[in-house]
Regions:
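Flexible "arm" and connector segments at domain edges
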Residues: 1-116
């Protein structure tokens, strides 16, 4: 479970990414545009997830061999950093998906206001 303070920082990261998306690309004009953007972002999450699963597990397996052989030397970091890096990439891609969701929610809310 993620800590409360970390959850707050995650929310701040999503808000910041949302503001950056809006600043660079504006708001969505319709649901077709929103769908296309979120589909692309979700595909990037899937790619990052596959990379994480492959690279992270490979490095974790190598790390486990070192642990079993009681060979914990300076090279251990060479196996931990790729896990960190691929997890970081996956987290960044997920934040982008969350930001795009916020943009799409704004479009939905705007349409609801127009109906009222």
């Amino acid at each position: 479970m993620i800590g409360e303070e970390t959850e707050m920082h995650l929310h701040e990261a999503v808000v910041s990414e949302h503001e950056s998306c809006v600043s660079n690309h504006g708001y969505f004009k319709n649901h077709h545009e929103a769908y296309g953007v979120i589909k692309e972002e979700m595909e990037e999450v899937l790619d990052a997830s596959e990379s994480f699963a492959g690279r992270a597990m490979q490095n974790l397996d190598s790390l486990w061999l070192k642990i079993k052989e009681d060979d914990m030397d300076n090279e251990v970091g060479e196996h931990i950093m790729p896990i960190y890096d691929t997890a970081n990439e996956l987290a960044r891609e997920c934040i982008q998906v969350m930001a795009v969701c916020k943009k799409w929610i704004r479009l939905i809310n705007k349409e609801c206001e127009e109906v009222e």
